[in-house]
Amino acid sequence: PFQRLGVGSLGGKGRGLAFFFTKMNELGLQDEYPEVEIGVPRTLVLATGRFTHFIESNQLSEIVLSDATDEELSQAFLNGKFADEDLIVMRQMLDLIDWPLAVRSSSLLEDALHQPFAGVYSTFMLPNDHPDLEVRITQLGQAIKLVYASTFYSKAKAYVAATPNSIEEERMAVVIQEVVGANHGESFYPTIAGVARSHNHYPVGSIEPEDGLAAIALGLGRSVAEGEKCIRVSPSHPKRIHQFAN
C-alpha cells in the first residue's frame, strides 16, 4: 500500500508516512485493539527527483526564481508536460482506484522539528469519481503541478526567507493518498479526524501532562488543523471533556 516513484527524497510528510508504515507491525496496535482497523491508506509518493525532472524538462528554472505572481507560476506549471513514466503510473493508479484522493505537498523542509512549514504549501482533494479515466488523469496531473508550483508562491518564498534555508535548495515531493471515509448523502468524509499529542501543556484537574491530548472533529479535520472549534480530550480520561473558549 506504500509505493514511491523516482529517485531522491520522499520529503517531510512522505518520510513520516514511510516510517509509520514500516513500524506498524512492530507497534502491535492491531493486537491491542483487534476491533479497530489501523493502517496507512494506500499511498504513492512522487520523490523529489520527479519534481527536479519536471522543472528542468519544462524549462521552468528561470521563472520559479523570478518575481512572477502566483497566478503566472500556476499557469506556467499547468502548461508543463509530465514524463511518460509519470503518466503511466498515474494511469495505473487511477485504473485501480476510483476513491477520493488527497494530493499533498511533501517538501524537503516540511515537518521539520523546529520549522514545520505547516500550511505553507498546497494540498488538493480530488473526488476522483468521473466516469472518464482520462478526465481523472488530467485532474490528478493538474493537482500535482499546482503542488509543485506552490513551492515558489510568494507565501512560501517569504516563509523560507525568514529561516536559515534558501528557496533554491527547496525540493518538492508529492504524496498521493486515498482519503479515509465513507459516503454520507452527497458528501464524503470520515466520522472523525484529529491530531493527537503525547504531552498536554494545559492539564486540568487530575489529568497529567503525560496523559496526552487529542483534538478531534467531525469529518476531515480541517477545523482542527486551522485552530477552529473542536473537541479536546485526554485519551486517558475520555469522559472528562474540558473545553476552553478557543
Give a label for each model feature:
Residues 1-32, 80-246:
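Conserved mixed alpha/beta core segments that line enzyme active sites in large multi-domain catalysts
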Residues 1-66, 70-81:
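A conserved helix-loop-beta module that forms one wall/lid of the active-site cleft
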